[in-house]
Amino acid sequence: GSIPCGESCVFIPCISGLAGCSCKNRVCYLN
């Protein structure tokens, strides 16, 4: 929840979600 993964999730889910990133405020974050 604090480290940006450099990916947005406005239209599609976080591809980086495979690495543990989650969508928050249309941006993918790690932890």
Curated annotation (Swiss-Prot):
Cross-link (Cyclopeptide (Gly-Asn)), chain numbering: 1-31
Keyword set, alphabetical order: Disulfide bond, Plant defense
Disulfide bonds: 5-21, 9-23, 14-28
InterPro entries: Cyclotide, Cyclotide_bracelet_CS, Cyclotide_sf
SUPFAM superfamilies, alphabetized: Cyclotides (SSF57038)
Domain notes: The presence of a 'disulfide through disulfide knot' structurally defines this protein as a knottin.
Similarity remark: Belongs to the cyclotide family. Bracelet subfamily.
Identification of the protein by name: Cyclotide pali-A
Biological source species: Palicourea guianensis
